[in-house]
Structure formats: C-alpha cells, structure tokens
C-alpha cells in the first residue's frame, strides 16, 4: 500500500502568538527588502527635496538637513517653467511617446498572435531570429538609419516620423517575445473551439486573445512608455529640429544655462519624472502580472 501525501494547506494563524511568530520569522526578509527599497528611493527623495530648496541652502548644506531646518520654496519650479521652450518640450515628449507606444503594441500583439497560434512555414525559425535581435545593440543602427532617412527625401528627421519609426522598430523584438510567451499559455481548447465554430484568426485575436491578455499587453505598454519618455540618445539623433525635441533634450540644454544651479536642474529633472511615476504607480499591478506571465512558457 502506498502512502498518500498530505496535501492539505496549513491553516492561517489565528492567535496573536501565532501571528507574532510568523512576523518574526519573516522579519529578516522584510528587513532586507526594506533596506533595498530605501537605497533605491534615497536618490529620488534627495532630488525631490533639492528641487524645493533655496539655492543658497543647497550650496551650503546637504538635502538631509531639512529634517532639522526645513526651508522650502517653489521658486526653482517657477524659473524652470518660465524657461523658453519647456512647455513645448513637454508636449513634444507626449507627441513622441504616445505613438511610439501604441504602434509597437499593435504590431507586436498581432505578430505574437501569429507566432503563437497561426501555423505557417518557418514559424519557429522566424521567432528565433526575432529573439536573436534582442541582442543587437541599438547603436549599430544609428548610421544606416540616419543615412536612409536623410537620403529618402521625406524629411523624417525634421518631424516626428523618424523617432516614431526607430522606437517602434527597436521595441518590436522584446514586445513580440513577451507577448508570444504569454499568448501560448492561453487555453488551447478555447482557441480550437472558436475555430470549430467558424471564427477567423482576426476574430479569435480580437474577441478571445486580447481580452485575456490585458496584463501582458499593459506591462509591455508601460515598459515602452517609460523607455521612450526617458530616452535621450535617440531623440538627440532622430529629432534634429529644435521644435520637436522632448523634455530630456531640453533639460540637457539647461545644463548650459544653469550649469551650477543644481536646485533648478533638480526641479527640471523631477518634472520629467512626474508622468512616468503617475503611469507606473497607476498600472504597476498589470506591469508585475504581465512580466511574470510572459517570462516563462
């Protein structure tokens, strides 16, 4: 006779002593995680505090002295917002980031569905090539793409087109990899039942796959939004007209104007952080769920 394993779940602790024992047992883990979070947050906290400090205080003392002598001002933000082109640069960041997020989402989700559920020749080979493209550095494409855009005569380097296309192209391999790995975890019986009922691939993608894949799609969208919003290098190369340059480029230009005014530069840097912080905090649940689901087969 074979022994049966006890698979019953352990009951939750009910008494105070049991809860206290569990908390003490988890104490080292919580302590380590708390220290990691503190180290991660200290630079951002310092940046925020510095952005509200008077310039004279910033030059004479460290930002942590506000714990004993709190003195704050909004003058730094007022001067930065009054700088020429800041408002336009903020709008440019939105005009660059939103299309550069939506385009990869649309293309990557459709391509990932095809690679996961549509049978066609060399499907696995194509997926391996796409995965291999993840290892290609972005910098290797700068010269050929800039040359191609310039010689095309379309003026893409003087409008948003070049930035949109390059961000989309470099985002697709990761997006296809992430979403395809999530799509193949969907119930096969559900997909096959829809096909038996006469649903087309487009119908299956629209009515079944997309509603079930909201966490993965949202995670990829958040990741792409944050990446494009914080990008400096590609904006410097592909947004070659001052009128279309985003906030990241504008802040680097402020270094020449306020080279030693670190409180002003801190205010400008924190203005860039506001939108990504709002997006991530609002949608972080989808971000974590999507990454965990798409990281394994």
PLM region spans:
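A structural signal for multi-pass alpha-helical bundles of membrane permease subunits
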Residues: 26-297
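Short, Lys/Arg-rich, polar N-terminal cytosolic tail immediately upstream
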Residues: 1-22
